[in-house]
Each structure stands twice: as C-alpha cells, then as structure tokens.
Amino acid sequence: MSQSNTQEGDLLLTTGEDLSTYADVLVAPYNSSGLLVVTRPAANNDYALYVLVYGAVPGGQATVRPMSPNRTVRITAKGAGNPGDLLVLADGVTTAADRGKVRSVAGLTSGSGTYRLVGVAEELFVDGQLVRTRPTFGSVTV
C-alpha cells in the first residue's frame, strides 16, 4: 500500500474568493487553472467538504478542516432545527449571504430542488448558531 504525500488534520488551502471575514461555514474545492482553491459553495448541491476555520483574502491561505464522520464540527445554521435533523447546504444561490451555512431538511418546501446532505444535527439550534454536526454525505431531493 502506498500512502505517501497525504495529509491529516487542518489544511492550508488557497482561497478563490475573499474569505477573510468568514469562519465556521462550509467551503468547497474547485479547480482554478490546475490549482486547488476553496470558496463558499456556488450551488446547493456542491461538494462542501471542509469547514472554514480561518479565512483569508483571495489567493491567500485559509485554514480548513476536512469533514469526517469520526469527528463532530460546528457550522453556522440558517434557520432553526432539532437534534437528529438532516442538514443540507443553505440556499446560497438565492441569498448569497447564506453560502456555506447549513439548514434543516425539515424546512425545505416540496419541489425546491436537490441539496447536498452534509450532516446530522446533534443538538437543538436556532438561526445563526454554531450547530454541532455529525458529518455525513449524500444528496436530498425535495
């Protein structure tokens, strides 16, 4: 087995947008001329695999934490929810300020589209709270 040149724990990744005023939101990996960069998710079904720990200016090095089911993370919530609620990316397409936040599937209306499932809430939460989340991955269509 060859597992050289791998990394564990927090990573320093180049930003593809100004993330200097953000933390505790999800960011997704993208290709920029052959370079891995992270930005807040551009679509509701993007693969937002990292929690932003410390943001940075465009082209700077942001500290991100890869999500793993082995470790809970805290992510900024959009709206309220309950323990056990499935969490998906908030609708950052309609409201840019919500990019990278999570919301409960229970709050989605029928026919609203496909969303990236990112975790399960492990506590009661309200809008703007850093909700304790157990990461999981998938898609939810409503």
Features from the language model and the residues they span:
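Glycine-anchored, exposed beta-strand/edge motif detector
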Residues: 1-142
